[in-house]
From Swiss-Prot:
It catalyses: 2 ATP = 3',3'-c-di-AMP + 2 diphosphate. This is DNA integrity scanning protein DisA. GO terms for biological process: DNA repair. It is an enzyme of class 2 (transferase). The keyword Transferase applies. Homooctamer.
Length: 359
């Protein structure tokens, strides 16, 4: 699920300065040379209006050129695609009324220029030996690949534990669905775990972007762990969305779940109300019946359009489980072969779900 536009700009900038990129190589050279730098990652009329002095270059970017130009006083201005060095030794004069929380002259200028122009700005501190990125209204210190990888591996271990627990509660929910014993608590617990897993995965995805070429193995592990999770998240909401004004609007519910605070996400009652359930303190113990989206999605080679038609026709999973081949054939797009496949698929799923729970 896409985040706010500022998050997209932030991630794109992290990718541009990730380890393994020519630009990051240039920044590392500046750090190793124990010099500072102020670099604007973009050029337009607004940036030009803030520039005084210096000289125009308009030459192809290279890490060595960036390192040599950083030895001079003044800022360096790059093209938006970081392919060319536009100006060097420039004195930047941003609006002094633009608010900044920084104290050092270079960092104050960097933050103000970033806010005033909308372009990312890099400040390399000679004394603190850090690279600070100012973009989309935030300040972010770039760490080395080893530090990022350490945090990423911790997050990945957490994701593995949460995914294991998710598989357990999802399996329990499937068995309860077959027996028609589902309560609001059972369904909401799965939605809660799915959202928690998604948030941890989002954090790891940021590390993958920040690691650049060093994040390939991490990306493969993340992809394997998250296979089918987003689909399961949507189908669970569609299965249990109460009939009414919100019925069919699963996308809105998913967006509201994504926007929940970490504290609210721990409260099953709050999640239940976001999904659309109403009632008193006993709301979580109310018995409910799924529509059958989750179970039908596990039947091999069953198109989504046919799944929607089956759910519209039978309305609940219990009616689907009780339907014979002839009943299934009454649905548009379901011939005899597909009807038998659905019937056999549901029977196998019912049997395996019960066995997993009780054996």
């Amino acid at each position: 699920m896409a985040g706010p536009p500022g998050d997209d700009i932030f991630r794109a900038t992290l990718a541009a300065v990730a380890p393994g990129t020519p630009f990051r190589d240039g920044l590392e050279r500046i750090l190793r040379g124990h010099t500072g730098a102020l670099i604007v990652l973009g050029h337009d009329k607004v940036v030009e209006g803030l520039c005084t002095g210096g000289f125009e270059l308009d030459v192809e970017f290279s890490a060595t050129r960036l390192r040599e130009l950083a030895k001079m006083d003044g800022a360096i201005v790059l093209s938006s695609d970081l392919a060319r060095i536009v100006r060097a030794a420039v004195h930047l004069v941003p609006d002094p009324t633009v608010p900044t929380e920084e104290s050092g002259t270079r960092h104050r200028t960097a933050e103000r220029v970033a806010k005033q122009t909308g372009f990312p700005v890099i400040s390399v501190s000679q004394s603190m030996h850090i690279i600070a990125l100012y973009v989309a209204g935030r300040r972010y210190v770039l760490d080395g690949a080893a530090a990022i990888l350490s945090r990423a591996n911790q997050a990945l271990a957490t994701l593995e534990r949460y995914k294991l627990r998710l598989d357990e509660v999802a399996g329990t929910l499937s068995a309860l669905e077959i027996e028609d014993l589902v309560t609001v608590r059972d369904a909401i617990s799965v939605s809660q775990r799915l959202e928690m897993v998604r948030r941890i995965a989002d954090e790891i995805e940021s590390y993958v972007v920040e690691l650049g070429t060093d994040g390939r193995l991490l990306s493969l592990q993340l992809e394997e762990l998250m296979a089918g999770v987003e689909t399961e998240r949507e189908l669970t909401v569609r299965d249990y969305l109460p009939v009414g004004s919100r019925a069919g609007n699963a996308a809105q519910v998913l967006a509201e779940l994504s926007a929940m605070s970490p504290t609210d996400l721990l409260d099953l009652t709050v999640i239940a109300r976001v999904i659309g359930f109403s009632g008193g303190a006993d709301i979580l113990d109310r018995q409910i019946s799924p529509r059958g989206y989750r179970m039908l999605a596990k039947v091999p080679r069953l198109p989504r359009m046919v799944v929607d038609r089956l759910v519209d026709h039978f309305s609940t999973l219990q009616k689907l489980l009780a339907a014979g081949v002839d009943d299934l054939q009454a649905v548009d797009g379901v011939g005899e072969t597909r009807a038998r496949a659905v019937r056999e698929g549901l029977s196998r799923l019912a049997e395996s779900s019960i066995l997993e729970r009780y054996v």
